[in-house]
């Protein structure tokens, strides 16, 4: 792109950053420093506002950049992410949303510790939540780096690295200054921008093919170089048994992982009642479902109009398919329309990244302060002290996310999110479901469920082709690959459930049935909910 084109895109980036910083400053004027205000925004948001914020939190760089890129490169197999991300919300709606809102205050650990020995359970759940959040943050950082590399013509590695650092700095500012209230409004603004941008691009793609989806798919298949195989399963997850098991593993992780994501669970605490939480999820499903239907058109549109080779040439993982599609739909690289549309889409993608990293950072810093700090500190911490720790933790989490984001910069963002979902489904979902629905569940079972899912998931990722043993690995020059699957969910998710069951049946501690009855009534009726 020319210097003028880069300037326009950077101006739009800067405008969004200025708006979000203004929102953060405005929201932080009247803050009182209470934990409820910092973690939950005072529980003052309406179901519609929270539904938009949930969708803004969930529709990440993985959705806008990564999924469309995978569809553009691998056709049918890329659709697994679309189906998995959407179907996952049925699990959230029917099993989690209302019960979590009634039983907890700020974090996942609040729900689990309601009927257990608090200290070991909070430490385990807090550790797991921070781990999942950092993995999810890494994907957003990689998306930011890919976006700016494209904007600057892919020639400046330093600019790409500084972008990752800049995103990390901004997310710390958003969280430490504005807490949940600022984060929520940033996510609402971003959701509106993202839906508007996706609708505009989808309409332009359909107009290009005269509204004929069949023609769009045929053109994508012809341009892909794979013919009809592009529209059939197996291009990415086909062939041998390893690829097929990887397909199943990823599907399990995507469908079950959403219900264990800390930054999604924390959104249910920002509304006043469980009924409002359920209605928030209904709003979110409508928005998210509409968005993922559009990613189908955008992914195949990028394959048909831009071509997989051009997408892969810009970014090997496919993370730049949507901006390239916008450039072409607007008239090409040398046209004013192409430049403007590219800049708008790039700014929306950047807004997507900033909004999501703010929500994830807030959830992880809340886990550090509310779960780990208060548990490791023998004396009960004051709310203001806890909030101070959360703000400090945001800085540390930002540094870790930046470092890992620089390391993983060449991986696909949707793939990285798939790993985060696998860890969430392995470590957080078993303990959450057991706590809510199993009367005989014990403290040992809770701790074993978390670590029995978390440790194998991380270990299997380290021993997988993601880290070593192939040209696409993080460390292609070494080989300590002993686990053949790229996503550990198929093995680690059952292990999490098994460990929770085994820890409970071997525990000498009798289950507290009175506390379970109290929790059950509270979760179903809302009696005594905060």
Predicted regions and their residues:
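Loop-to-helix junctions at membrane interfaces in multi-pass transport proteins
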Residues: 2-6, 42-45, 49, 66-80, ...
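Short, Lys/Arg-enriched, Gly/Pro-containing loop segments at transmembrane-helix junctions
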Residues: 32-38, 110, 213-218, 414-417, ...
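Alpha-helical transmembrane segments
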Residues: 5-18, 81-92, 244-253, 347-354, ...
């Amino acid at each position: 792109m020319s210097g003028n084109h880069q300037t326009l895109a950077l101006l739009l980036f800067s405008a969004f950053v200025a708006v979000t910083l203004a929102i953060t400053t405005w929201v932080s004027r009247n803050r009182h420093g209470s934990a409820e205000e910092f973690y939950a925004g005072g529980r003052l948001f309406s179901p519609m506002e929270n539904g938009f914020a949930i969708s803004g939190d969930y529709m990440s760089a993985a959705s806008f950049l990564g999924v469309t890129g995978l569809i553009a490169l691998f056709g049918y197999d890329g659709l697994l992410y679309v189906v998995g991300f959407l179907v996952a919300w049925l699990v959230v709606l029917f099993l989690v949303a209302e019960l979590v809102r009634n039983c907890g205050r700020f974090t996942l650990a609040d729900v689990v510790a309601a009927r257990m020995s608090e200290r070991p359970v909070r430490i385990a759940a807090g550790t797991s939540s921070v781990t999942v959040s950092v993995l999810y943050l890494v994907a957003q950082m990689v998306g930011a780096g890919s976006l700016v590399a494209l904007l600057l013509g892919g020639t400046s590695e330093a600019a790409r690295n500084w972008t990752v650092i800049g995103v990390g700095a901004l997310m710390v500012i958003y969280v430490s200054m504005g807490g949940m209230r600022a984060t929520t409004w940033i996510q609402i603004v971003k959701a509106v921008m993202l839906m508007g941008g996706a609708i505009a691009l989808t309409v332009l793609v359909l107009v290009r093919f005269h509204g004929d989806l069949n023609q769009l798919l045929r053109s994508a298949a012809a341009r892909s170089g794979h013919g009809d195989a592009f529209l059939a399963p197996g291009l990415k997850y086909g062939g041998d048994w390893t690829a097929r098991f990887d397909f199943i593993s990823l599907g399990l992780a995507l469908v079950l992982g959403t219900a264990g994501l800390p930054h999604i669970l924390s959104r249910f605490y920002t509304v006043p009642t469980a009924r409002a939480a359920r209605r928030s999820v209904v709003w979110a499903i409508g928005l998210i479902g509409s968005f993922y239907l559009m990613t189908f058109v955008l992914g195949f549109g990028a394959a048909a109009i831009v071509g997989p080779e051009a997408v892969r040439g810009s970014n090997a993982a496919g993370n730049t398919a949507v901006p390239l599609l916008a450039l072409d739909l607007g008239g090409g690289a040398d046209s004013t329309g192409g430049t403007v549309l590219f800049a708008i889409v790039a700014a929306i993608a950047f807004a997507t990244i900033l909004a999501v990293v703010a929500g994830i950072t807030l959830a992880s810093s809340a886990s550090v302060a509310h779960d780990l700090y208060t548990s490791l500190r023998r004396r009960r911490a004051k709310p203001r002290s806890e909030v101070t720790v959360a703000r400090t933790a945001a800085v540390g989490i930002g540094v870790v996310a930046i470092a890992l984001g620089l390391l993983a910069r060449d991986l696909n963002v949707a793939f990285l999110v798939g790993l985060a979902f696998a860890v969430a489904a392995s470590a957080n979902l078993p303990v959450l479901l057991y706590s809510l629905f199993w009367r005989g569940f014990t403290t040992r079972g809770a701790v074993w469920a978390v670590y029995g899912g978390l440790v194998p998931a991380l270990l299997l990722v380290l021993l997988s082709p993601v880290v070593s043993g192939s040209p696409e690995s993080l460390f292609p020059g070494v080989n300590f690959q002993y686990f053949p699957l790229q996503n550990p969910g198929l093995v680690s998710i059952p292990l999490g459930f098994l460990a929770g069951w085994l820890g409970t049946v071997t525990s000498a501690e009798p289950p507290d049935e009175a506390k379970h009855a109290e929790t059950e009534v509270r979760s179903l009726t809302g009696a005594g909910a905060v």
